[in-house]
Amino acid sequence: MSFIAIIPSRYASTRLPGKPLADIAGKPMVVHVMAQAQASGAERVIVATDHPDVQHAVLQAGGEVCMTRADHNSGTERLAEVVELCGFADDDIIVNVQGDEPLIPPQIIRQVAENLARCDAGMATLAVPIHDAAEAFNPNAVKVVRDSQGYALYFSRAAIPWDRERFAVSQSQIGQTFLRHIGIYAYRAGFIRRYVNWAPSQLEQIEMLEQLRVLWYGEKIHVDVALQAPGTGVDTPEDLDCVRAILASQGQN
């Protein structure tokens, strides 16, 4: 099965300026992400960026880069520009790999692509079980509920589904029904072309979750349970230190 991995890599970051070029074990973070995507077996791995320094780092590492505009509101919009610039066919499977996930397992990059190829949804993603009550009630951990076929019913920052009987007694323990959404997506290129023409939905603006636009317009998202949990993503300087420590413990200094 053939698929293309695209890594949106925005240079500007409020909490961590120049994040794609942050040094991790002697290499820029974006190069680590690119290597993980290449190990997934993707036919092509393309870094989409708006900054010449990121372009230079990717080319220096032997990667493929596509320069995009700087005014995109989301990674999906940047993805759509790459789809048009590269002229991908509507049936081509595109995996959106977050540019701040240097520890993402190659296995799950391939898994989400294979998941999309097997179903009739325009979009597929992954989730992992939640076992900790604090995570279930953390608004930064996005929860998802699915139907009997694995299609998303809703994504929320709230604790869903609400276990009425259990939580009436205590909210310190949760059952086995919670899933945390992982921010990796697979789409067919034709779906991306349609998606960027849809106006933002009320629900996505309330929850600040872009994927809710898909459900709002009546499209399906298939959600599989990830074969492997993703590693630490990099949003803050503390996250960056954590990733550096993990790789150092693995002998990458």
Curated annotation (Swiss-Prot):
The keyword Transferase applies. It catalyses: 3-deoxy-alpha-D-manno-oct-2-ulosonate + CTP = CMP-3-deoxy-beta-D-manno-octulosonate + diphosphate. Its main location: cytoplasm. GO terms for biological process: CMP-keto-3-deoxy-D-manno-octulosonic acid biosynthetic process; lipopolysaccharide biosynthetic process. The keyword Kinase does not apply. It is an enzyme of class 2 (transferase). GO terms for molecular function: 3-deoxy-manno-octulosonate cytidylyltransferase activity. It is found in: Cytoplasm. GO terms for cellular component: cytosol. Belongs to the KdsB family. Activates KDO (a required 8-carbon sugar) for incorporation into bacterial lipopolysaccharide in Gram-negative bacteria. NCBIfam families: kdsB, PRK05450.1-3, PRK05450.1-5, PRK13368.1. This is 3-deoxy-manno-octulosonate cytidylyltransferase. It comes from Edwardsiella ictaluri (strain 93-146).
